[in-house]
């Protein structure tokens, strides 16, 4: 006890400026703060991994702010860049930090698409922003960033191995290049920066952080809150009615329910608005709603003592929505990380997390069983192998040319930005040259006499659409604004027009379309109608990862191999004049299953009639014995199927602006040919063993 007291006192003494502002109201440091603050004070780059609401934000800020306050002169430049994945999280952080930083006489501001423009002549000491707004700042106000001393990346696992994560890697390279240039001109005296990344759930944090900055020290504190999980079969609306009706006996007042799609959020909110303990305190939160509408829902939900909110992944992250008594999951998310993120939103001020997992089929039940077991064991599964997405090259070149002094760039110099921290290129030079040639042919760029690139007509169109700084939205997605007839306010966006007179669900309420003008749908509130349905809203679909598919197969009791190397088949005899049907239990996910089917068709002249994440249904006889194929045969299957699979992976909004060869190569990289070969090479096809 005395040792811990002495440790706390010593740490407090090391923070003479920031203790009172950031920690005094808590009275003590949390474990992650005890472990993280000393190395950060010493100037080390760190990645902090600990549970939600454990104090990671203060652990990162205190040492960085302390370094600023050590200088007695007022600091008038932007010093700390804090990068978050969502605008809502940025707003939440600035609300939390405004008062503490006022005590330190330091200004904090938010820079996102929702906020007013920054005054470049009077920047804050701390800027909270998203990758997209960071990109815009680099392109339009690069000099404002030359004095940055530290970069913090919040929710690192949300970014990594996604288009936005790849974008962030290149943005940091651009920032480092900018600072080297400023140093060479004598504008700054030191181009060094300190880095800190934060995450609650991440596998191999050192390797992940090393993609963004050098020499990361891992500061990891184990210990998730205890999990009380209940699995409930969701048969109908009555199931949730019964669940919510008994909440009073559980002393549950505030519930956050995660759905798998925006349409489900709308439908469930409409169904639950009457006859539940929540009355009219039923809210909806998803990406198709306008930012102001979402913000209103966040505020109302946080301030309500009794409330229910249906949300998609938009509320997965750690914005303050008050103390949630119960998390309800309607359908299983696609991976463990999303499951942990969602359940982490509940009971943040207690030692236990309560969650009800509602499954609609046996696969969802198996997924929940796997996720709950992993969460209770504190396990974090490995993510899919990392690959760099070439579509980011298109977006970053379009942004980088805006940053250059004369509005033109040297493609060879720009290529150096697309490299890891050791200078190894992230894509082949041949592919890069193809991209440059393709973008020039498509008039994104024109070429000067000295082989420099200048913006072309297609670039100008992107710029007018304010689309050159983001990888978030599909370029082909055309939306229609939903406008409230009475107030004139935008409620959100839909992707297909609703005919005047039609009734639909939006924002948890029934709306009637009154008229449709160009890209604007005018609506009024409508009386609840049982036939009202949500508008068609597209949702991304992702294939199940091979390791997760294997775990699902084992949980469901699918035929298992007698030996680890066996690939189990079940052959069903058909009528004499028909070929047999062979069920191939690959248990490796949809993507691997699809290409395995291509390989089997090539090897055995059979026909695949159906496939999913666990099995193939093959018309014809698949012989037992070694499964022998080549990587060339796998690539041949990918060449036939790449277009079908392109939308399965997160490849970035500029994927279709790549030359065909590079598009195919990026699908192949996402598919992970080496992983496929490792999974199936040397496997032996064997009939399932039947129980005696």
What is each model feature region?
Residues 299-301, 305, 472-497:
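Short, compositionally biased strand/turn segments
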């Amino acid at each position: 006890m005395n040792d811990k007291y002495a440790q706390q006192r010593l740490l407090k003494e090391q923070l003479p400026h920031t203790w009172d502002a950031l920690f005094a109201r808590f009275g003590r440091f949390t474990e992650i703060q005890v472990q993280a603050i000393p190395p950060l004070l010493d100037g080390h780059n760190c990645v902090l991994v600990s549970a939600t609401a454990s104090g990671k934000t203060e652990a990162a800020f205190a040492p960085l702010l302390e370094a600023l306050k050590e200088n007695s002169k007022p600091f008038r430049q932007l010093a700390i860049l804090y990068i978050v994945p969502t605008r809502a999280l940025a707003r939440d952080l600035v609300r939390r930090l405004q008062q503490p930083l006022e005590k330190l006489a330091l200004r904090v501001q938010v820079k996102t698409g929702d906020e007013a423009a920054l005054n470049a002549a009077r920047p804050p000491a701390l800027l909270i922003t998203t990758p997209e707004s960071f990109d815009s700042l680099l392109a339009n106000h690069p000099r404002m960033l030359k004095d940055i001393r530290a970069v913090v990346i919040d929710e690192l696992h949300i970014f990594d191995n996604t288009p936005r994560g790849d974008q962030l890697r290149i943005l940091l390279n651009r920032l480092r290049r900018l600072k080297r240039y400023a140093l060479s001109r004598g504008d700054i005296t030191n181009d060094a920066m300190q880095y800190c990344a934060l995450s609650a759930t991440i596998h191999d944090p050192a390797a992940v952080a090393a993609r963004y900055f050098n020499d990361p020290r891992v500061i990891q504190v184990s210990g998730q809150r205890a999990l009380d999980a209940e699995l409930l079969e969701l048969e109908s609306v009555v199931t949730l009615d019964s669940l919510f009706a008994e909440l009073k006996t559980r002393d549950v007042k505030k519930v956050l329910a995660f759905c798998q799609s925006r349409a489900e959020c709308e439908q469930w909110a409409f169904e639950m608005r009457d006859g539940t303990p929540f009355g009219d305190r039923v809210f909806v939160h998803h990406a198709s709603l306008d930012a102001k509408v979402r913000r209103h829902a966040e505020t109302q939900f946080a301030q309500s003592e009794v409330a229910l909110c249906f949300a998609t992944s938009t509320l997965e992250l750690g914005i303050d929505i008050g103390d949630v008594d119960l998390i309800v999951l309607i359908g299983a998310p696609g991976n463990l990380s999303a499951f942990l993120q969602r359940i982490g939103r509940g009971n943040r001020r207690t030692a236990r997390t309560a969650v009800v997992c509602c499954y609609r089929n046996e696969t969802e039940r198996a997924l929940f069983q796997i996720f709950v077991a992993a969460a209770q064991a504190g396990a974090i599964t490995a993510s899919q192998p990392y690959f760099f997405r070439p579509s980011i090259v298109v977006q970053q070149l379009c942004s980088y040319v805006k940053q250059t002094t004369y509005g033109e760039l040297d493609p060879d110099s720009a290529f150096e930005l697309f490299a890891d921290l050791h200078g190894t290129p992230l894509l082949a030079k041949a592919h890069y040259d193809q991209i440059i040639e393709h973008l020039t042919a498509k008039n994104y760029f024109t070429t000067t006499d000295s082989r420099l690139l200048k913006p072309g007509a297609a670039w100008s169109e992107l710029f007018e659409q304010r689309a050159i700084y983001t990888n978030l939205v599909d370029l082909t997605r055309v939306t229609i604004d939903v406008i409230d007839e009475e107030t004139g306010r935008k409620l959100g966006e839909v992707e297909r027009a609703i005919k005047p007179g039609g009734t639909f669900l939006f924002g948890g309420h029934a709306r009637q379309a009154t008229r449709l003008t160009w890209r604007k749908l005018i609506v009024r509130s409508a009386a609840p109608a049982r036939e009202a349905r949500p508008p068609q809203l597209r949702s991304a679909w992702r294939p199940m990862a091979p390791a997760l598919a294997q775990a699902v197969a084992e949980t469901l009791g699918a035929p298992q191999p007698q030996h680890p190397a066996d690939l189990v088949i079940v052959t069903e005899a058909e009528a004499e004049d028909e070929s047999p049907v062979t069920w191939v239990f690959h248990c490796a996910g949809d993507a691997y299953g699809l290409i395995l089917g291509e390989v089997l068709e090539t090897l055995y002249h059979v026909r695949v009639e159906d496939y999913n994440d666990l099995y193939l249904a093959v018309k014809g006889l698949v012989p037992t014995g070694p499964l022998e194929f080549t990587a060339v045969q796998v690539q041949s299957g990918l060449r036939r199927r790449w277009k079908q699979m392109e939308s399965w992976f997160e490849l970035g909004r500029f994927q279709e602006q790549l030359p065909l060869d590079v598009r195919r190569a990026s699908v192949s990289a996402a598919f992970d040919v080496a992983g496929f070969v490792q999974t199936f090479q040397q496997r032996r096809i064997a009939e399932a063993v039947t129980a005696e």
